[in-house]
Amino acid sequence: METNYQKFLAGEYCNHLDQEVLQMIVQTKNLLARLNATNITDSATRDALLRQMLGSIGKYSSIDINFHCECGKHIFIGDKVIINMNCTFLDDNIIKIGNNVLIAPNVQLYTATHPINANERFVNDWDERSGDLFFRTKALPITIDRKS
């Protein structure tokens, strides 16, 4: 049987309140708090925090101040990538950014999605004791190819 985390990565509907997923999010939020409180000139500390939090980050790549993400470890950044200030990456699934990519300020990348039709989006027979969400959500991967 697939875990909720495996369902997320497979692009299937799943429960975002699963303990495995929540634990990953909390750990990432703690690292983000440290990253965003670190002086932008302290590149050694910022680099160490990014390497601990992200799936990978390439050579000569940087992320500016006020960065936010969900899980962190689903973000893979190539070489010579600049992610400007105030960016948000909701990485419930994989986000791959190729080499030589420049990302402007305030860019938001969301892997999470919901059905557009409200009848499909909400669980009609939802029971609050079930531990499940009252709405359906899934996550799909994002790829930004090189030199974008």
Please place each PLM-identified region on the residue numbering.
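Terminal amphipathic alpha-helical/low-complexity segments used for targeting or macromolecular assembly
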Residues: 1-59, 116
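Short, glycine/charge-rich beta-strand/loop segments that flank catalytic centers
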Residues: 47-48, 66-68
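Flexible, glycine/small-residue-enriched loop-and-beta-strand segment within the central core
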Residues: 67-77, 82-147
